[in-house]
């Protein structure tokens, strides 16, 4: 199997996985985060959140300096020591937030789709929606390559909206609480593969990878991991992978950071 000592990368979703979906608590995972940090194992956060939000969380969690995947893979924040890589400190995949916003405004105006984006409201409203402080809510609006929205139309109209976005080279992705529009070329899996390849190029050896997630939008990330933890989540659809070999995939009984801890216990403590 694998051990905490060998070259290893841990990729983790945030809301509903490392963070509690409601309280944003992460303390049940704290002992494992400390052990991984002491073993120099990078814990690479992957989320629909903005890089500004995630850099704040990195500091809170004691994970500064390592790369992270923001906006569902449309943004890669590079590791501090990767300053020689083109694009430092961030790599943007596909078209910009501003360009996507223009597309959405046109679709809403001409085809009358009903939705509310984070750009339509102020930080106080987002704080009410999310339970975040206003200062943290302000960070959620600093998108660089995606748009976050609340869908307010029918399922039939959603199918039409998704089709129109696909025609325009965009994708519509469901997150833990909100929907996200980003370039069709972007994804957590592509971003993770790029980071893995970069670590391999720098060290001369491909690291073993472990991924943790709780929602359907985490499936592409977990598919490209060597080992995966599917944290019990609130989403009705759940997470379904092509390869669910029990030697590779563990489904937790607990939710959020307690499930995160359970997954690490399964793959490391028992061996």
Curated annotation (Swiss-Prot):
Catalytic activity: 2-O-(alpha-D-mannosyl)-3-phosphoglycerate + H2O = (2R)-2-O-(alpha-D-mannosyl)-glycerate + phosphate
Subcellular location: Cytoplasm
Gene Ontology molecular function, alphabetical: magnesium ion binding; mannosyl-3-phosphoglycerate phosphatase activity
Active-site residues, Swiss-Prot/TrEMBL: 13
GO cellular component assignments: cytosol
Swiss-Prot/TrEMBL keywords: Cytoplasm, Hydrolase, Magnesium, Metal-binding
Biological process according to GO: mannosylglycerate biosynthetic process
Binding site for Mg(2+): 13, 15, 214
Cofactor: Mg(2+)
EC number of this enzyme: 3.1.3.70
Enzyme class name: hydrolase
Family: Belongs to the HAD-like hydrolase superfamily. MPGP family.
Protein's recorded name: Mannosyl-3-phosphoglycerate phosphatase
Provenance organism: Shigella boydii serotype 4 (strain Sb227)
């Amino acid at each position: 199997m694998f051990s905490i000592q060998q070259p290893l990368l841990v990729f983790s979703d945030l809301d509903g996985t490392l963070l509690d979906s409601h309280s944003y608590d992460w303390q049940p995972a704290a002992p494992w985060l400390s052990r991984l940090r002491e073993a120099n194992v990078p814990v690479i956060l992957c989320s629909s959140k903005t890089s500004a939000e995630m850099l704040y969380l990195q500091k809170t969690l004691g994970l500064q300096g390592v790369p992270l995947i923001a906006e569902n893979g449309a943004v890669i924040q590079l590791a501090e020591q990767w300053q020689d890589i083109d694009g430092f400190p961030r790599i943007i995949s596909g078209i910009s937030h501003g360009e996507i916003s223009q597309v959405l405004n046109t679709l809403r105006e001409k085809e009358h789709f009903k939705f509310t984006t984070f750009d339509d409201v102020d930080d106080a409203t987002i704080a009410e929606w999310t339970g975040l402080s206003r200062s943290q809510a302000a960070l959620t609006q600093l998108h660089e390559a995606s748009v976050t929205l609340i869908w307010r139309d029918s399922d039939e109209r959603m199918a039409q909206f998704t089709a129109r976005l696909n025609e325009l080279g965009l994708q519509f992705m469901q997150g833990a609480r909100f929907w996200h529009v980003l370039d069709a070329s972007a994804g957590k899996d592509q971003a993770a593969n790029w980071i893995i390849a970069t670590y391999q190029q720098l060290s001369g050896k491909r690291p073993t990878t472990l991924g943790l997630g709780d929602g359907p939008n985490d499936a592409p990330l977990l598919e490209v991991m060597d080992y995966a933890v599917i944290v019990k989540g609130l989403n009705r659809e759940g997470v379904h992978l092509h390869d669910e070999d029990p030697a590779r995939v563990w489904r937790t009984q607990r939710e959020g950071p307690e499930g995160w801890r359970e997954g690490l216990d399964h793959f490391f403590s028992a061996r």
